[in-house]
Amino acid sequence: PRRSMSEQAPRPERLVALFVTVFWAAVVFAVDGLLAVILDRDPIQSDVGPYYSVFAFVIAGLVLWMLLSGTSTSRHPVWGAVGAVALVYLSFLLIAALWDLPLVVEQALSPFVLTAAVLAGAAVVATWAGIRSLRWRRSRG
């Protein structure tokens, strides 16, 4: 028998994943801002307007949220973290491909995109560790 939405078991991992994704975006913006000052360059050198970066971050965030939701209860975070790094990096490149090829090359070599991807992998590991620790404490109490 099929259960209704109100009868289904709650999935706190999805909500935790959403909060972690929002936190990831905030940290990426902060770190990229510091990197821009340190490197004395803009995160996006090309004149693409404001929509590329917003669209790329939304898509990368959705990718990260889905990965976090799916990997937060896995046995270990390694493949989830590797997947997050790769898929967030690729999402920036694929969205850049909608604009033009020079932007793809620029983003592929960008320390800002690499930072976002590495921080996505770190977010997967941190979420996995946090949920695992919470479940371990609940099972003991």
List each language-model region with its residue ranges.
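Transmembrane alpha-helical segments of multi-pass membrane proteins
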Residues: F19-F23, V78-L94
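Cytoplasmic membrane-interface segments at the C-terminal ends of transmembrane helices
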Residues: R3-A17, R41-D42, G61-A84, V104, ...
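Generic hydrophobic-segment detector
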Residues: L15, F23, A116-A120
